[in-house]
C-alpha cells in the first residue's frame, strides 16, 4: 500500500470526496483516507502522478509520503500545528465579537448604555455591527474559501454549511440595513424599528466564532488521539557511538549502517537493532513490548532500537537499521492501521458522502416551507440557517477513526499491534480461539520437571550422574538436564568412553564406573526395574512428560522427567477466554495421550492431536464453519493457518514484528495478551457504537429542531447561534469519548461479558475427518529406538519429506509410524529413510 499526505480536508465529507475520486482512477483497487492523520493509503497499479492529479482536481493537495527517515520525521508530521493557529483565530474573533454582542444584544435586550455617537443613531448601530462582522469573517475566511471552493467542485463539506449559513445571515442583515436606511430617510420610524429587529450580524459572527471554538477543541482532542504514535516516534534515538577504523565516533543514528559496530553505555538508548558481541546487561524493553521487567542480555543475544541499557557496557553489531528496525516496523504497523477502515465505518462513510447536499436541500425546503406558511423572510431564513449550522458530518466521520486510532495506541503501549482496523474490529467478535501448543501454551523448550531418586540414592547423586552423562549429548532432552545442572552450579568431570545409542540412550564411564541413561527399554537391558518405578514412569508419561532413567554400574539411580512445560500465565489466560464465552481449542502434533495431558493442565475445551504443520490450515477451515476463529501461533509453520483464520495472532514476535501472515502481532510470549487483545477490541467496538449513536442521534434530533418542526407543538425554536454551539461541541464530544479508551484496563476481567453463543463444537476428531479426505492408502511401520516427542518429530519430518507420503502419524510410545500415502512407494525406501536417522525399522505392514 502506497502512502500519501493529503492536505485541505476539513471534515468527513472531504474525506469521502477524496476517497471517491481516487477510487475512480484506473488501476486503483482500494483506497483508504484518514482525516485524523491527513494520510491516504492506495493499493493498485495506478501511478502516483495520476492519483495526485485526481486529488488536486477535487480541490485538495496530495504528495507521496517520503519513506526515508520516517520514524524521526513522523513525529514532526503528526505534530499538532492546527490547534495553535485555531486558538489564535479564536482569541482575535472573541476580541471583536464582544463589542458586537454588546451593541446587538446588550443594548437591545438589557438596555445597556451606548456610546454617545450611537445614541438614536440606528444606521450607525447597523454599520458598526456590519464592520465588526466583516472583521470576524475576514479572520475566519478559511471557512468561506474551503466551503465555496468545495461547492464549486460539487463536493460540499462542513465548511460549505458554515459558509452558507454565515453568508445568508450576513447577506440578509446587510439588506435589512440598507432597507432601514431608506426607511429612516423616508422618516418611517416604525419600519426602521422593524428592520432593526431583522439584523442577524451577531448570528453570522457568533456562528463563525463558535465553530472556530469547536474546531479548536476538536483539533486539540484529535492531537491527543495520536499521542501514542508520536511517543513511539519520539523514542527513536538521535545519536549513536560507532567504532570505525578503530576509532570511536558519535554519529546520527540515521547514519548507522548494517554491520557497523556500536557501543552502548549504561543509561543510553540502543540506536539500532543489533546482536551483542561483548558484555552483559539488563535491557529495559518496556517501550516496545510493554514488559516492565528488564531482560538480561549477553553475548549472542539480540537487542532492539529504543530499548534502554540499564547496567552493563555493551558492544554490538548492527543487524537492522533505518526502516528495518523493530521500532520502525512497529511505527509503520500502527500508522498503516490508522490509515485503514473498519467495516463498521462503511455506514458512516455512505451517510457522509450525501450528508451535506441533503442538509442544504433540507435548509432550502425549510425556508420555502416557512415562507409558504406566512412567516417573514427573517424568520424563515433563521430556521434555514439553523439547519445549516447545526448539522455536523464530522461527528459521523470521526466516530470510527478516532476510536481506532486511540485503540491502536493503547494496544501499542501494551505490546499488542493490530495491522488493520479490520483486525481490531474482528478480534472482539471471535467465537473460537485455536492455540498452537508449542511456543504458545508451552514455553517451547524442554525443562526438568520431576526428580525421583531410587531408594538409597540422594537427589544430588542422581543429578550429578545425569549432568555428567548428558553434557556430551546433543539431544534436546539432554540440553534440558544440562541447563538444570548449570542452574544448580554442578561441576563434575567429563565422562570417558561416551557413546550415544540413537533412539535409546547414552553410556559412559566416570571414575571407573559405568553410567547409563535413556528410556525404559534401554535401561532394562542391563538391570531389572521394579513395578513401582515403572508405575511412576507411567504416571509421568500420562502427564505429558518424558521419563529418563539413569543407572550406575547396573544399579538404578532414579528418574528425571523432562517436558515442554506450560507457561505460567497460560491456564489463567485460557480461563479468561472461556469466561468471555470463547471456545478454546489446542492444536498439536503430539500424540493424543501427551496432548490430552497438556490440554487438561491448560484447561482448554478441546484438544486436536496429531495435527501436521500443513494440516493446521484445514483444521482452521473446519473450525470456521462453526464460528469466527482466531488462530494463535508463534509464526513457525503457522502461516497458512494464521492466514486462513478470521483473525491470525502471532505470539512472541519479539523483535520480528514483520509477520506477514498475522493480523495481530503480540510482542511478548505471554498468552495473557490474547484475552487482552480481545478485550481491547471489544472496548473499541463498544466505543464506536457509542460514537455512532451520538452522531446519528444528534443529527436526527438536531435537524428537525433547527428546522422548527417543534414550533407548532411546543413553541420551541432554535436560534442559529445555539445551533452553531451545538455543532461545535458535537465533534468534540465524539473525540473526547474516544479518548476515554486510554483509561481502559485491558488486563482487568471485571467488566468482561460472556459472549452469547450457540456454537456446538464437537472437535476432538476434526483433524481425522480432514485427513480421511486424502486417505488413499496407509502403511504401519514398527520402529525401535524412539524415546520422546523429539524423536517422533525427527521420524515424522523425514517421512513427510518423501513426495509419495501425504502424512505420517508417529508414536514413540507405541513404536509405530502410520504413513498415509498419496501414491505407491517401496517398503525399502521407507525403511532406509527412517534408518538414515539412526532408528531401527523392525517391520512394515
Language model region names:
Residues 26-49, 198-199, 230-324, 422-466, ...:
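Conserved cytosolic catalytic loops of P-type ATPases
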Residues 16, 430, 510-512, 544-546, ...:
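Conserved ATP-binding TGD loop and adjacent catalytic N/P-domain core of P-type ATPases
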Residues 85-239, 350, 715-720, 726, ...:
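Transmembrane helix-loop-helix hairpins at the membrane interface
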Residues 1-124, 222, 231, 247-248, ...:
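Flexible metal-binding regulatory segments at protein termini and peripheral loops
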Residues 74, 180, 189-190, 205-266, ...:
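Juxtamembrane coupling segments of multi-pass membrane pumps/enzymes
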Residues 88, 307, 428-435, 441-474, ...:
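ATP-driven catalytic headpiece of P-type ATPases
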Residues 109-123, 152, 156, 171, ...:
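Membrane-embedded alpha-helical bundles of multi-pass transporters
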Residues 288, 347, 382, 395-469, ...:
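Conserved catalytic phosphorylation-site environment of P-type ATPases
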Amino acid at each position: 500500500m502506497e502512502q500519501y499526505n493529503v492536505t485541505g480536508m476539513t471534515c468527513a465529507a472531504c474525506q469521502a470526496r477524496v476517497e471517491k475520486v481516487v477510487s475512480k482512477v484506473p488501476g486503483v483497487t482500494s483506497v483508504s483516507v484518514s482525516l485524523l492523520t491527513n494520510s491516504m493509503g492506495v493499493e493498485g497499479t495506478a501511478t502516483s502522478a495520476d492519483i495526485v492529479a485526481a486529488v488536486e482536481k477535487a480541490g485538495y493537495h496530495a504528495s507521496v509520503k517520503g519513506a526515508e527517515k520516517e520514524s524521526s520525521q513522523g513525529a514532526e508530521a503528526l505534530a499538532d500545528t492546527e490547534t495553535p493557529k485555531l486558538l489564535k483565530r479564536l482569541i482575535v474573533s472573541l476580541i471583536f465579537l464582544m463589542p458586537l454582542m454588546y451593541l446587538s444584544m446588550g443594548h437591545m435586550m438589557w438596555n445597556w448604555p451606548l456610546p454617545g455617537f450611537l445614541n438614536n443613531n440606528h444606521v450607525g448601530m447597523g454599520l458598526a455591527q456590519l464592520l465588526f462582522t466583516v472583521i470576524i469573517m475576514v479572520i475566519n475566511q478559511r471557512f468561506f474559501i474551503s466551503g465555496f471552493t468545495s461547492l464549486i467542485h460539487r463536493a460540499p463539506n462542513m465548511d460549505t454549511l458554515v459558509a452558507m449559513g454565515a453568508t445568508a445571515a450576513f447577506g440578509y442583515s446587510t439588506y435589512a440595513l440598507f432597507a432601514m436606511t431608506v426607511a429612516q430617510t423616508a422618516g418611517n420610524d416604525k419600519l426602521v424599528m422593524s428592520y432593526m429587529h431583522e439584523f442577524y450580524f451577531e448570528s453570522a459572527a457568533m456562528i463563525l466564532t463558535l465553530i472556530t471554538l469547536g474546531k479548536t477543541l476538536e483539533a486539540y482532542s484529535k492531537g491527543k488521539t495520536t499521542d501514542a504514535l508520536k511517543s513511539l516516534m519520539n523514542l527513536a534515538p538521535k545519536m549513536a557511538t560507532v567504532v570505525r577504523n578503530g576509532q570511536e565516533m558519535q554519529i546520527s543514528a540515521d547514519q548507522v549502517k548494517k554491520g557497523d559496530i556500536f557501543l552502548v553505555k549504561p543509561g543510553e538508548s540502543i540506536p539500532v537493532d543489533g546482536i551483542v558481541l561483548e558484555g552483559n546487561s539488563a535491557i529495559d524493553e518496556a517501550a516496545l513490548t510493554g514488559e516492565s521487567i528488564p531482560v538480561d542480555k549477553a553475548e549472542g543475544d539480540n537487542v532492539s532500537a529504543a530499548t534502554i541499557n540499564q547496567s552493563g557496557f555493551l558492544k554490538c553489531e548492527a543487524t537492522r537499521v533505518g526502516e528495518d528496525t523493530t521500532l520502525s516496523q512497529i511505527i509503520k504497523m500502527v500508522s498503516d492501521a490508522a490509515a485503514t477502515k473498519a467495516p463498521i465505518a462503511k455506514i458512516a462513510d455512505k451517510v457522509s458522502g450525501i450528508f451535506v447536499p441533503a442538509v442544504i436541500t433540507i435548509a432550502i425546503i425549510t425556508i420555502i416551507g416557512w415562507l409558504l406558511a406566512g412567516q417573514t423572510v427573517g424568520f424563515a431564513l433563521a430556521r434555514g440557517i439553523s439547519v445549516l449550522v447545526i448539522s455536523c458530518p464530522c461527528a459521523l466521520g470521526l466516530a470510527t477513526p478516532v476510536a481506532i486510532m486511540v485503540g491502536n495506541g493503547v494496544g501499542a503501549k501494551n505490546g499488542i499491534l493490530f495491522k488493520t482496523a479490520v483486525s481490531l474490529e474482528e478480534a472482539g467478535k471471535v467465537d473460537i480461539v485455536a492455540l498452537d501448543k508449542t511456543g504458545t501454551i508451552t514455553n517451547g523448550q524442554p525443562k526438568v520437571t520431576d526428580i525421583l531418586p531410587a531408594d538409597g540414592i540422594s537427589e544430588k547423586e542422581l543429578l550429578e550422574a545425569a549432568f555428567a552423562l548428558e553434557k556430551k549429548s546433543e539431544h534436546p532432552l539432554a540440553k534440558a538436564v544440562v541447563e538444570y545442572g548449570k542452574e544448580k552450579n554442578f561441576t563434575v568431570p567429563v565422562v570417558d568412553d561416551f557413546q550415544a545409542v540413537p533412539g535409546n540412550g547414552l553410556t559412559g564411564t566416570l571414575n571407573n564406573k559405568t553410567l547409563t541413561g535413556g528410556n525404559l527399554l534401554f535401561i532394562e537391558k542391563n538391570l531389572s526395574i521394579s513395578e513401582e518405578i515403572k508405575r511412576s514412569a507411567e504416571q509421568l508419561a500420562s502427564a505429558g512428560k518424558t521419563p529418563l532413567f539413569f543407572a550406575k554400574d547396573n544399579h538404578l539411580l532414579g528418574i528425571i522427567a523432562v517436558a515442554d512445560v506450560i507457561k505460567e500465565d497460560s491456564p489463567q489466560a485460557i480461563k479468561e477466554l472461556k469466561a468471555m464465552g470463547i471456545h478454546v481449542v489446542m492444536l498439536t502434533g503430539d500424540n493424543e495421550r501427551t496432548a490430552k495431558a497438556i490440554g487438561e493442565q491448560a484447561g482448554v475445551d478441546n484438544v486436536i492431536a496429531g495435527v501436521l504443520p500443513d494440516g493446521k490450515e484445514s483444521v482452521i477451515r473446519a473450525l470456521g464453519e462453526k464460528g469466527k476463529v482466531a488462530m494463535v501461533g508463534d509464526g513457525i509453520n503457522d502461516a497458512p493457518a494464521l492466514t486462513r483464520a478470521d483473525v491470525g495472532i502471532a505470539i512472541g514476535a519479539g523483535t520480528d514484528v514483520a509477520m506477514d501472515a498475522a493480523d495481530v502481532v503480540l510482542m511478548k510470549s505471554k498468552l495473557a495478551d490474547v484475552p487482552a487483545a480481545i478485550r481491547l477490541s471489544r472496548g473499541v467496538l463498544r466505543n464506536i457504537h457509542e460514537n455512532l449513536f451520538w452522531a446519528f442521534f444528534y443529527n436526527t434530533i438536531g435537524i428537525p429542531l433547527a428546522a422548527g418542526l417543534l414550533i407548532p407543538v411546543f413553541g420551541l425554536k432554535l436560534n442559529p447561534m445555539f445551533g452553531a454551539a451545538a455543532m461545535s461541541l458535537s465533534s468534540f464530544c465524539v473525540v473526547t469519548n474516544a479518548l476515554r479508551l486510554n483509561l481502559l484496563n485491558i488486563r482487568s476481567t471485571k467488566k468482561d461479558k460472556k459472549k452469547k453463543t450457540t456454537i456446538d463444537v464437537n472437535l476432538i476428531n476434526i483433524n481425522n475427518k480432514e485427513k480421511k479426505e486424502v486417505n488413499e492408502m496407509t502403511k504401519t511401520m514398527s520402529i525401535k529406538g524412539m524415546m520422546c516427542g523429539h524423536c517422533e518429530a525427527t521420524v515424522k519430518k523425514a517421512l513427510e519429506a518423501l513426495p509419495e507420503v501425504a502424512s505420517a502419524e508417529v508414536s514413540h510410545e507405541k513404536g509405530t509410524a502410520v504413513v498415509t500415502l498419496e501414491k505407491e512407494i517401496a517398503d525399502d525406501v521407507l525403511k532406509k529413510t527412517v534408518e538414515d536417522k539412526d532408528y531401527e525399522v523392525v517391520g512394515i505392514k
